[in-house]
């Protein structure tokens, strides 16, 4: 995995530089996500490793419809270097670069029940205030939390779940 990240890093940086230069950071983000998902499909991965598939065909297979010509050329370069296997890591690193440049934090909010829109807005507002940047939120439900929520921003985890409070209470009672 570390080697894959090492191999992917220069491609992610190059993609980010090209996309920003063209003012298409978000379009490239979506295109990379699409291409990485397609390349990760086992059937497509087998096809991509076929010796008769040239790099232009591989890029065409992985490109979303209406992709920027520079993006297609970028995929051709990766295919020519036989590095399509690290496309998922390229997409992940690209997203980190985009988030840093645009001062965006991705937060995963997991709650015991589905959050009402106003509750979600209150949490997002509090996160924006705490981190002083924009927040991209994904939500999930985990009934084992019993109540409350867990917010994971990658670097910071805020655990306000009843499950964790009970676990801490149990630990303090047994020691």
UniProtKB/Swiss-Prot annotation:
Family, similarity comment: Belongs to the ATPase delta chain family.
Alphabetized UniProt keyword annotations: ATP synthesis, Cell inner membrane, Cell membrane, CF(1), Hydrogen ion transport, Ion transport, Membrane, Transport
Role summary: F(1)F(0) ATP synthase produces ATP from ADP in the presence of a proton or sodium gradient. F-type ATPases consist of two structural domains, F(1) containing the extramembraneous catalytic core and F(0) containing the membrane proton channel, linked together by a central stalk and a peripheral stalk. During catalysis, ATP synthesis in the catalytic domain of F(1) is coupled via a rotary mechanism of the central stalk subunits to proton translocation.
Pfam families in the record: OSCP
NCBIfam families cross-referenced by the UniProt entry: ATP_synt_delta, PRK05758.2-2
A single GO molecular function term of this UniProt record: proton-transporting ATP synthase activity, rotational mechanism
Annotated source species: Xylella fastidiosa (strain Temecula1 / ATCC 700964)
Membrane topology: Peripheral membrane protein
InterPro entries reported in the protein's UniProt record: ATP_synth_OSCP/delta_N_sf, ATPase_OSCP/dsu
Name the record gives this protein: ATP synthase subunit delta
TM spans (from-to): none
Keyword Membrane belongs to the record: yes
Recorded GO CC terms: plasma membrane; proton-transporting ATP synthase complex
Subcellular location, principal: membrane
UniProt keyword annotation of Transport present: yes
Annotated localization: Cell inner membrane
Self-association state and partner proteins as the record states: F-type ATPases have 2 components, F(1) - the catalytic core - and F(0) - the membrane proton channel. F(1) has five subunits: alpha(3), beta(3), gamma(1), delta(1), epsilon(1). F(0) has three main subunits: a(1), b(2) and c(10-14). The alpha and beta chains form an alternating ring which encloses part of the gamma chain. F(1) is attached to F(0) by a central stalk formed by the gamma and epsilon chains, while a peripheral stalk is formed by the delta and b chains.
